[in-house]
């Protein structure tokens, strides 16, 4: 019925052309978006397998459909590997995304109208931590904390807000914060007011797995994550916990299915299993150590060139460049760097006077370039080229020269050999 040698370029040339162009873009452009990475060919192979055909509502051994004996194996492998990777006693690998993992925890442990205390999006948090444009800020009474003048989380202010508002849940985690978080301090604050502590470690999950960033699992009631970003797996979500009470496990299991999702994506769950196996390899720790080394090299070079990094540096995979007071906006910078084939994203910075669609900042991250094989000197060079462009975004001579250097660097480090 379906020939294995069918060619997409023959059947749907328009789509095939777009995919081929994206493949070329990934090879020919430097990827510095902190939330992006390249997954392995094995992960892609599994995600494109016949497992996509199988419906498997429920959990391993307790399905609502027959014929699930083999996908049960795949899901159980993902669960056991996730538990081993993070030192967890519980893992749910069915969430379709990190946002849905967060949503599941909210719905499992909260009632509409309950108060949550999360990090402000404008100060480095995530949409799902209570932003008013997100369901987390619409269904719940969201109180937001931020960073101090040094760009660091103000734990005293977090504690004061918790004592004032008595949240049912404290949310820790970020999408644009470059320092280590004191998970124990967050748990102490949550305990003071009898709140749950949810940690969203989506950005640093790979670093946590490799032991190069503090693990939140000993401190949080529940931890969520994406499975891509620094974990380098397929796009998806996960919920893990260490020594959870049985009542909590039951709530989480029942809210993921049937509470907010139906059939799990078995091809994605199997791909998660592959990614977790890869993350358990010794080489993964070496990779994550290099991610941080590269980020430090890049941030240090940008600061030497006169660019401000929020919080004064980085202890993880990302950095936030603060361009308040400069003529070039985040939007302008993103466009100028795009011309030289360096892909970044504009990002709001604390106390940003510009709109979220323009911004005064850039978020940069090193997971993807480190996957390509970049070392510290490569990232020093890259940071100088970024500064060259930001110093003269309209100078066609600079743009042409940097684009040529980027092309040579990309050729030196292909993604898929």
UniProtKB/Swiss-Prot annotation:
Chief localisation class: cytoplasm
Signal peptide: none
Species name: Xylella fastidiosa (strain Temecula1 / ATCC 700964)
Protein name: Serine hydroxymethyltransferase
Keyword Secreted recorded: no
GO MF terms, alphabetically ordered: glycine hydroxymethyltransferase activity; pyridoxal phosphate binding
Lineage: Bacteria, Pseudomonadati, Pseudomonadota, Gammaproteobacteria, Lysobacterales
NCBIfam families per UniProt: PRK00011.1 (NF000586)
Domain of life, source organism: Bacteria
EC number(s) reported in the record: 2.1.2.1
